[in-house]
Amino acid sequence: MKKIVALTLACALAAGLFLSACSVEKVDPNGGDDGFVSGSDTPAGENTPAATDTGNTGSGGNREVTVYSWGEYIDESLIQEFQDQTGITVNYRTVPSNEELYSLLQQGSISPDVIVPSDYMISQLIEEDWLQPLDYDQIPNFEKIADRFKNLSYDPENLYTVPYTWGTLGIIYNTTMVDAPITSWEAMFSDENAGNVLFIDNSRDAFGMALMYLGYSVNTTNEDEIRQAAALVADAWDRGVYQGKGMDEIFNLMEGDNVAIATYYAGDYLSMYENNENLAYVIPEEGSNWFVDAMCILKNAKNVDEAHEWINFMASTDANLRNMDYIWYASPNEEALEMYPEWYEEQYGEPLDMDLYEIMAAPQEVLDRCEAYLVMPQELRTLYNDLWTELFA
């Protein structure tokens, strides 16, 4: 996948840049914008349409939509195509995690129309009345979403969301830097690779891997089990098992042979593997997390019609085929998922490696060993946050 852009992407990563024809702005998780549009030398706000976040009603002037999602999570040619087709300017910004997105929303420092959070965060946003129900009459491509991705626990009546991607969390490891294939979450807590291990910088995934290793559900509401998991991570941290924690940093360090083991997502693994075939991916024997990221519209969105147009465009079969090919995350669009192997062969003149395809679109027997994160009661969210803060105090 992404064979056409593989060399360009590799060079961009090596230079520490994300090169594109479209403007994508990264947001400072401490609040506000980072001041520059990624892939540009132009300060945000100077002659670039992606630099403003003022919103627009879409009537009597330029139409626009502001989208917040994760980094390197879209084929940017789709942004340009949507703009060309509709005349709607897309202000596309990125944040590193669900927790940072939530924090920015709470601070009131961002005003998105569309966001693309993960399942458990969607549940929380619905519970706290952040989202508005969608007008599915404006999203005819919702019919193309496979039934198994509808009416899930985070949106049981399917009032607020259109799935964007799905995938799994696992362990990525460098086969030249470990003594044997990894099969268990034990690798994340063992001294065997001390100083050469990274974990994801959010409490849900970090404590989740410990809960799974201990044999508990990632959705446990037992405070003692949660504290045991936090203590396991803290002990490994104190023993020097971890080189550190991160999000985008994990991608670059693993791809560059600079760390042996990390927890990360299947789609990102496949992007790394494209440039480093020393890497392997495993769903540990104890199980893992499978997730859905979905498109939602904020209750106070300023560009509601434009937001619906964007969601419908991104739910189309063509957009899903191209996006799946670019970002390596599986599509919830049933047609795209079924067509992809044949589409790939037509695009690149060779068969798709089905082993890689099954990492991207995990078969049911793998998903049966995984759990989706469910929203936790407020008191447990507070406990997670407190334990996470204590860990790095």
Where do the language-model regions lie?
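Early extracytoplasmic/lumenal segment of secretory-pathway proteins
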Residues: 51-124
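Extracytoplasmic ligand-binding site segments that recognize negatively charged/polar headgroups
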Residues: 68-75, 111, 116-258
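Mature extracytoplasmic/periplasmic domains
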Residues: 298-365
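Bacterial signal peptide processing site
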Residues: 23-26
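Periplasmic-binding protein-like
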Residues: 227-236, 275-299
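Conserved C-terminal helix/tail region of periplasmic/extracytoplasmic solute-binding proteins
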Residues: 360-393
